[in-house]
From Swiss-Prot:
SUPFAM superfamilies: C-terminal domain of arginine repressor, Winged helix' DNA-binding domain. It is found in: Cytoplasm. Its main location: cytoplasm. This is Arginine repressor.
Length: 160
């Protein structure tokens, strides 16, 4: 195992063990664990580990990307406020600051029903692939994100 691999393992252990909100906090924890790194090196390590900052009720913290096929969607459950669909797209409302992480997780999961996502701070536009009806896609996303589905037919109802 190289020194870079050992450092990345330490970064992963620290993120799993503690609530780390900034790279400065993480650099300090790494130094206490006996590792030296620059902010640029740490930033590359975080990207390689699939770490991301996720906003939650207690502020933004780093989380590691999921190893599963869902692209990390399971870790983001509870951050979705609602899912709605119209005739052409799906709109997901999230807690403030959570939309980019959720959109990335959807993209990484690569559900065949999704052509692509566009995320703002708390809103995600999801374009359905092919001829798939957006309301059916909304129901599938509600299932993936662990959000109860209230969609029925083509009425455009919301899920909460």
């Amino acid at each position: 195992m190289t020194s870079a691999d050992r450092r990345r393992d330490a970064v992963a252990r620290i993120i799993r063990a503690r609530r780390i909100g900034t790279q400065e906090e993480l650099l300090a924890a790494l130094e206490r664990a006996g590792f030296r790194a620059t902010q640029a090196t740490l930033s590359r390590d975080l990207a390689r580990l699939g770490a991301r900052r996720v906003s939650g009720p207690e502020g933004a913290v780093y989380e590691l990307g999921a190893d599963g096929a869902d692209g990390g969607l399971a870790a983001l459950r509870g951050l979705v406020s609602s899912i709605a669909a119209n005739a052409s797209m799906v709109v997901i409302r999230t807690h403030p600051g959570s939309a980019p992480a959720i959109a990335r997780a959807i993209d990484l999961a690569q559900p065949p029903e999704v052509l692509g996502t566009i995320a703002g701070d708390d809103t995600i536009f999801v374009a359905p692939a092919g001829e798939l009806r957006p309301r059916r896609l909304a129901a599938r996303l509600a299932e993936l994100l662990g959000t109860p589905s209230a969609l029925a037919g083509d009425g455009g109802e919301r899920t909460h």
